[in-house]
């Protein structure tokens, strides 16, 4: 992973994240165009990243599909597909650490939201829909940025 890959990922993730927050849907074009842009960049300028990227893109949806099945389709198919773009950006070596970070960020956000709602008397059911793409994007960007920054030290 390098900074250019991270910028390409962030560019295409903005639309995915905004749409997921607003409508709980991730547009396929963001995944297809983002993946094509990342693959083109890696093939032309960063050949050393392509194997890890393809491995991450192949393994990530398997993990998210398993989560989708285990949770009785609680996770949307858009998140499963979006994991392809995430895996392609981070590579297999960083993708799963990024997903752990995404889950932690999500848990902290919703725990604080729950406590705030409890304090204000607002009621939200346990079945509330969660847009997970923002947390996936945050996890990928955080872990990849830390990885790149640590290479300068």
Task: Write out the residue ranges for each language-model feature.
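A membrane-topology feature that recognizes alpha-helical transmembrane segments
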Residues: 1-153
């Amino acid at each position: 992973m390098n900074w250019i890959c991270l910028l390409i990922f962030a560019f295409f993730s903005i639309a995915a994240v905004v749409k997921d927050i607003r409508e709980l849907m991730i547009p396929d074009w963001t995944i297809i165009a983002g993946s094509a842009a990342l693959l083109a960049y890696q093939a032309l300028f960063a050949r050393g990243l392509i194997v890890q990227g393809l491995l991450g893109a192949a393994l990530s949806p398997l993990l998210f599909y398993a989560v989708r099945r285990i949770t009785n389709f609680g996770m949307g198919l858009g998140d499963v597909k979006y994991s392809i773009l995430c895996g392609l950006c981070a590579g297999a070596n960083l993708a799963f650490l990024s997903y752990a970070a995404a889950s932690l960020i999500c848990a902290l956000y919703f725990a604080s939201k729950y406590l705030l709602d409890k304090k204000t008397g607002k009621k939200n059911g346990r079945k509330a829909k969660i847009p997970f793409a923002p947390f996936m994007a945050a996890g990928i960007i955080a872990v990849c940025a830390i990885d790149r920054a640590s290479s300068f030290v």
